[in-house]
From Swiss-Prot:
It comes from Bos taurus (Bovine). Residues 1-11 have a biased composition (Basic and acidic residues). Keywords: Coiled coil, Phosphoprotein. Residues 246-258 have a biased composition (Acidic residues). This is Pleckstrin homology domain-containing family O member 2. The modification Phosphothreonine is found at T298, T311. Residues 1-21, 170-419 are annotated as: Disordered. The modification Phosphoserine is found at S167, S237, S238, S273, S399. Residues 18-119 form the PH domain. It comes from the Eukaryota.
Length: 499
């Protein structure tokens, strides 16, 4: 510490030894005509003690430096006087204090010491830690009454309740049994109810056989329920014609394991004699009874449920076909026999998807013959025409090119239209079978046979025309070879770009 302000003859007291700074400084008494008096100053931490002499017997003033902002040099008129001032901080009611040092070095040392004291006074609240004994934190559970024994463990009943609430029917803990073995998971009622719905045999993996076995297997599937559901007895009239009994026999497709029952044999009334049947292929059956069609559809849908997803139901017939069919039904009874013969199309128009071209000669011969003569026997088959096999519109898997090609410009519509047209042709053939059964059975004797026959032929012709238009549209919508090459290049570029 500096002792320049202390008088030469005196010794420094003990309190001055513990002070930060001590010395003689002139202090202004304040007022307009302030008097400067010599005072002995002691700087202790954040307090400035003012004494009249070094004995420190009488303390004139105690200054709290925390109430002041700073200590700086005082610009006086006479620069030869080394004066400095303590500036109060705003909000305090203390007055500014002016000091005068004996030299410039003493003034600078006092300014520095007083500024340090001011900082200590400002930070006094942060440096000191006050502990208030009245604000003792109380423990949360300290006031709880202590028992002689600890808390008892949870009972088995409580554990059982918790297990029942947590398991929620998934896994139940058997707490009643003392052995507590592995739990037995009993199936619920929903699982038992759902078991009969499952198919008895799992679907076989898809194979790639030749088209001929597929046709034969499909024939087996369709022939089995038809033959088992309603086996018709052989009429007495068939016994009288042993020659025609041989014609009624149809070849039965045999599996490697078991033989299938023979097809349903129709009575003589429902048999249609076909002129010039083709020796290579058996003529398709258009004179089958209407109850056979739903049976065939159910037998066809049965095996498909196990292996493939069910196809969507057939859509409503088109407006064009509806209008044409209603128009023909309205104008059919009014037509003359000559007009029906003139409107009958040629063999090229009647053939649809490989259907035999022989209905027209049959119909003309039936109309020309006398009503009393019984029709000749002919071979019949319950196999459905090729349009019964619905095309698979949705492939099971698709390549990357197909995935990139799908979008707003995908061409799935022509295939759907083709399937829809095939269903329309199928409906027309069923109606034709109904009309032929009416004519041959003699149910409607008042209605002219030629009129009904002309209606059936016209319906077949319209269905064939719609099917041909849709096929032409599908050929027009085929993608160009350049577009396919472009798609392949895009797939190659995508595969190369994938890290």
């Amino acid at each position: 510490m500096e002792e320049e302000g202390v008088k030469e003859g005196g010794q420094r007291p003990r309190s001055a030894q513990t002070a930060d700074k001590a010395g003689w400084i002139k202090k202004s008494s304040g007022g307009f005509l302030g008097l400067w008096k010599d005072r002995y100053l002691l700087l202790c931490q954040a307090q400035l003690l003012v004494y009249e002499n070094e004995d420190e017997q009488k303390c004139v003033e105690t200054v709290e430096l925390g109430s002041y902002e700073k200590c700086q040099d005082l610009r006086a008129l006479l620069k030869r006087k080394h004066r400095f001032i303590l500036l109060r901080s705003p909000g305090n009611k203390v007055s500014d204090i002016k000091f005068q040092a004996p030299s410039g070095e003493e003034k600078e040392s006092w300014i520095k010491a007083l500024n340090e004291g001011i900082n200590r006074g400002k930070n006094k609240a942060f440096d000191e830690v006050k502990v208030d004994k009245s604000c003792v934190l109380e423990h949360v559970t300290r006031d709880r009454v202590r028992r002689d024994q600890r808390r008892r463990p949870p009972t088995r009943v409580h554990l059982k309740e918790v297990a029942n609430a947590a398991s929620d029917g998934l896994s139940r803990l058997d707490l009643d049994v003392p052995d507590s073995g592995p739990p037995v998971l009993a199936p619920s009622n929903d699982v038992d109810a759902a078991q009969p719905r499952e198919t008895p045999r799992p679907p076989m993996p898809p194979a790639k056989p030749s088209p001929a076995p597929e046709t034969s297997s499909a024939g087996d599937r369709m022939e089995t329920p038809v033959g088992q559901s309603a086996p018709a007895p052989v009429p007495a009239s068939s016994e009288a014609h042993p020659g025609s009994q041989e014609d009624l026999e149809t070849p039965v497709v045999e599996d490697s394991d078991s033989e299938q029952p023979p097809n349903r044999i129709l009575p003589d009334k429902l048999k249609v004699s076909w002129e010039n049947p083709s020796p290579e292929e058996a003529p398709d059956s258009e004179s089958a009874e209407p109850p056979q069609v739903p049976g065939a559809e159910t037998s066809e849908a049965g095996p498909r449920e196990g292996g493939k997803p069910p196809t969507p139901p057939p859509k409503i017939l088109s407006e064009k076909l509806k209008a044409s069919m209603s128009g023909m039904e309205a104008s059919g009874p009014a037509q003359s026999p000559g007009a029906s013969e003139a409107s009958a199309p040629g063999p090229a128009e009647v053939s649809v998807n490989g259907v035999d071209d022989s209905p027209e000669p049959l119909q003309s011969s039936q109309a020309a013959g006398p009503p009393g003569t019984p029709p000749k026997a002919a071979t019949t088959s319950t196999t459905l025409p090729p349009w019964d096999l619905q095309p698979q519109l949705h492939p099971r898997c698709s390549s990357l090119g197909d995935l990139l090609g799908e979008g707003p410009r995908r061409r799935r519509q022509p295939g759907e239209q083709l399937h829809r047209a095939q269903l329309e042709v199928k409906v027309a053939s069923e109606k034709t079978e109904k009309l032929l059964n009416k004519v041959l059975g003699g149910e409607s004797a008042s209605v002219n046979a030629e009129t009904l026959l002309s209606q059936a032929v016209e319906q077949l012709r319209q269905a064939t025309q719609v099917l041909q238009e849709i096929r032409d549209l599908e050929e027009m919508n085929r993608e160009a070879p350049g577009l396919r090459e472009k798609r392949r290049e895009l797939v190659t570029l995508y595969r190369r770009s994938v890290p």
